[in-house]
């Protein structure tokens, strides 16, 4: 039971620092990840290609805090299956906040190619010369050569003996991207404010559970010192009547935007959980600007709806049922709508007139921003569930953005 409670209380994986290990087969990536965590997480073997799919582990690492460690397959894997493994390793870059490039110093050609990919993706990295326990002495010329050719800092490590691990942790802490302390509600709420959270019971959520954006918003408001009051759509009137003064902010599920907007006191700000997630994970200004593309859609247009979750859809699913129905009601039944889930996302988006993405609560910010940049680079408008719904209901100009 304690383990289950732990899972409910720990930081969501999407909010953790993502650290990925890259390197050729048998340079000791799995041994290093086990040494860093102090646990036997990754399978270690002398057989090349032991790690096939990326191995992911969430844990706390001082002084870094909550992290996700990702052990990848060797990027020198060969053959048809090896090529697939290498492609999966390449995909990991999209969600990586910091990379560790592991080498044994015997060859650097492939490491150079991969550090170029990391630089192109703007991912900070540190090189690790592993297995130094097999050397009588680590030549400074070897470290200098690795640093020169890979273009970054190099740390000599023995995953077996634990040498250099403290220095590696300190170096990783220095490389953490400086995003400042991000508040989910931004400047929409401050200490002492009363905030009303309108939360219809979501059939997608497990029994007895709230969906992640609701949990994160509640925690954000508590951290700020706000007074948070929760209600369902049916209890909005009673909740407002119970307050001496109108709430400074109302956060609602996007699906009932119009209902809440009609009941909102004049002095209260209005936003949605999806809009908050759009600003937290993506580019909210780009999403608002892109929503105007909805007005240009015709029955010959093509729309892609992207959902981060991979849950089995239920009736009245917002991405698969409600938004498509709203779009076709406005544009016409001929509108083509494609749906993708999880990490499935087309490389070529140019055949689409609009991308509508969920709040991405299951993705880390870097992964979501990578999708935003992909859309922007290909000239394809991209918006968010909450922004799209507000635009379709004609109330986007009344929604407050964080």
Please state what every model-predicted region is.
Residues 2-83, 87, 91-94:
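Conserved G1/Walker A P-loop phosphate-binding module
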Residues 21, 101, 127-129, 197, ...:
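Structural beta-sheet core signal
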Residues 57-65, 70, 80-154, 183-187, ...:
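Conserved C-terminal guanine-recognition region of P-loop GTPase G domains, centered on the G4
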Residues 49, 73, 104-106, 130-134, ...:
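Short, ordered loop/turn segments at secondary-structure junctions
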Residues 193-402:
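P-loop NTP-binding site
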Residues 42-46, 177-185:
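Active-site phosphate-binding and catalytic loops of NTP-dependent enzymes
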Residues 28, 135-138, 142, 158-178, ...:
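Conserved GTPase G-domain signal focused on the G5
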Residues 37, 73-74, 104-105, 255, ...:
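Short glycine-/small-residue-rich Rossmann-like dinucleotide-binding loops
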């Amino acid at each position: 039971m304690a383990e289950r409670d732990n899972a409910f209380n720990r930081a969501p994986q999407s909010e953790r620092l993502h650290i990925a290990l890259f390197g050729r087969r048998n340079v000791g990536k799995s041994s290093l990840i086990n040494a860093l965590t102090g646990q036997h997480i990754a399978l270690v073997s002398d057989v090349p290609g032991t790690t096939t799919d990326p191995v992911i582990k969430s844990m706390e690492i001082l002084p870094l805090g909550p992290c996700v460690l990702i052990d990848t397959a060797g990027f020198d894997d060969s053959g048809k299956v090896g090529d697939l493994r290498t492609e999966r390793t390449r995909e990991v870059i999209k969600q990586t906040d910091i990379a560790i490039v592991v080498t044994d110093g015997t060859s650097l050609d492939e490491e150079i190619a991969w550090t170029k990919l990391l630089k192109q993706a703007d991912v900070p990295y540190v090189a690790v010369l592993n297995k130094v326990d097999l050397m009588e002495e680590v030549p400074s010329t070897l470290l200098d050569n690795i640093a020169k050719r890979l273009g970054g800092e190099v740390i000599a490590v023995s995953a077996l003996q634990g040498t250099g691990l403290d220095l590696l942790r300190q170096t990783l802490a220095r490389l953490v991207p400086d995003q400042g302390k991000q508040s989910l509600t931004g400047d929409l709420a401050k200490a002492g404010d009363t905030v009303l959270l309108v939360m219809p019971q979501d059939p997608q959520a497990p029994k007895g559970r709230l969906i992640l954006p609701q949990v994160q918003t509640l925690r954000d408001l508590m951290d700020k010192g706000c007074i948070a009051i929760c209600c369902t759509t049916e209890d909005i009137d009673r909740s407002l009547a119970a307050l001496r003064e109108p709430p400074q902010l109302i956060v609602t599920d996007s699906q009932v935007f119009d209902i809440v907007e009609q009941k909102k006191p004049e002095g209260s700000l209005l936003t949605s959980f999806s809009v908050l997630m759009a600003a937290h994970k993506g580019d909210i200004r780009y999403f608002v600007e892109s929503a105007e593309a909805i007005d240009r859609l015709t029955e010959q247009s093509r729309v892609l709806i992207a959902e981060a979750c991979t849950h089995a859809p239920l009736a009245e699913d917002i991405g698969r049922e409600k938004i498509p129905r709203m779009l076709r009601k406005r544009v016409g039944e001929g509108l083509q709508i494609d749906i993708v889930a999880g990490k499935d996302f087309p490389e070529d988006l140019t055949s689409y007139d609009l991308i509508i993405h969920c709040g991405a609560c299951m993705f880390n910010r870097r992964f979501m921003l990578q999708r935003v940049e992909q859309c922007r680079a290909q000239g394809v408008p991209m918006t968010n569930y909450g922004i799209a719904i507000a635009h379709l209901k004609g109330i986007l100009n009344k929604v407050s953005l964080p």
